[in-house]
Amino acid sequence: MSQGKVVQIIGAVVDIEFPQDAVPRVYDALRVTEGDLSGLTLEVQQQLGGGVVRGIALGTTDGLKRGLTVENTGNPIMVPVGTKTLGRIMDVLGNPIDEAGPIGEEERMSIHREAPSYEDQSSSVELLETGIKVIDLVCPFAKGGKVGLFGGAGVGKTVNMMELIRNIAIEHSGFSVFAGVGERTREGNDFYHEMNDSNVLDKVSLVYGQMNEPPGNRLRVALTGLTMAEKFRDEGRDVLFFVDNIYRYTLAGTEVSALLGRMPSAVGYQPTLAEEMGVLQERITSTKTGSITSIQAVYVPADDLTDPSPATTFAHLDATVVLSRDIASLGIYPAVDPLDSTSRQLDPLVIGQEHYDVARGVQTVLQRYKELKDIIAILGMDELSEEDKQVVSRARKIQRFLSQPFFVAEVFTGAPGKYVSLKDTISGFKGILDGEYDHLPEQAFYMVGSIEEALEKAKKA
């Protein structure tokens, strides 16, 4: 392959001069072949003219010197795919980082691929039961849909994601791919051990580009994970693709954009924000052979949902699960806001009339309680009408019944995790709305699985 020389280094951005007749294409992978950083991979981002290309380094550039030889591999970044990647931790280039020997893959695929054509895409609507009451009730997931977990720092995005992986691996025995994009290394480590302890590690491929890595790694690691998920889908499987955190993907794009000298747009984000997000999201889709159901954690800067990054993400999603700091402060976990969370599947034609009526009934009661809170704060409960007192009582029971002990949080809570089927979830909330459990104390509904457990808890109290 053609060889070039390093001519300029600015942080993670490196300019390399090639012969005029052998200039690498955009997105080609280049490899440094000499010096201390021999083996460092660069990805071409721009062709500057005069045989010079500008690349972004997928690794540290400390110790890189001008004049070093760089060779063009002639291909984009190629990563291992297939069942050999299950149970392994890899970096953005598909190299193992779990000290368990080579991957031994039978095939590698380019991380840059076209999205499936319109004819190939499937349009079937099938619900994916998660076993988490609040999600199954008010913002049900579709098989092959895209879900966003929105929340500020520390409200439980990663824990919710771990619970979803565990439930789907155990209850539905499906494969998952997890892309850790710009998150804490400690979380990546915890995640690995949690999956190991839950005996689901052999059903998950893990790809990490953590906070301490250069922006090129964080920008591309989501595509690495997606390529692995696409391979499973093309083999006819239903696969789950988890991204934690899609905001860091945007942020890495902002860093790369600034390093490449592009003009920033609103709030300092890259001018290509919508296009970069579209390139990733359009590939996450279901075809007639298999499905990719994607669950993406979305960090919301300063809890502001109108920030360009979360706002751009919203446009691509089928369901949004909004985690609320106010609900977390009440000690109700998962801290999902049932009034803010939505799903395109919440339609009687998709989920059936009974489910729809119960979900809307729950939201109506909670909304009325929210409106009455101001009156209660000023005048107290005694000033309410009997009807409103009943609404408040049921709303508080519903609020507590929306909480649930998680399997992955057993270590912290000391309570065994619960998986609640959709049927039990609907019948439980229907009973509360119909007044069947008005005689029970509200504390009986806190941190239980099905309604039967609430009845047991009330008897013991």
UniProtKB/Swiss-Prot annotation:
Enzymatic reactions: ATP + H2O + 4 H(+)(in) = ADP + phosphate + 5 H(+)(out)
Residues in the signal sequence: none
Enzyme class: translocase
Domain of life, source organism: Bacteria
Keyword annotations from UniProtKB, A to Z: ATP synthesis, ATP-binding, Cell inner membrane, Cell membrane, CF(1), Hydrogen ion transport, Ion transport, Membrane, Nucleotide-binding, Translocase, Transport
HAMAP family linked to this entry: ATP_synth_beta_bact
Subunit note: F-type ATPases have 2 components, CF(1) - the catalytic core - and CF(0) - the membrane proton channel. CF(1) has five subunits: alpha(3), beta(3), gamma(1), delta(1), epsilon(1). CF(0) has three main subunits: a(1), b(2) and c(9-12). The alpha and beta chains form an alternating ring which encloses part of the gamma chain. CF(1) is attached to CF(0) by a central stalk formed by the gamma and epsilon chains, while a peripheral stalk is formed by the delta and b chains.
Protein name: ATP synthase subunit beta
Source species: Alteromonas mediterranea (strain DSM 17117 / CIP 110805 / LMG 28347 / Deep ecotype)
Gene name for this UniProt entry: atpD
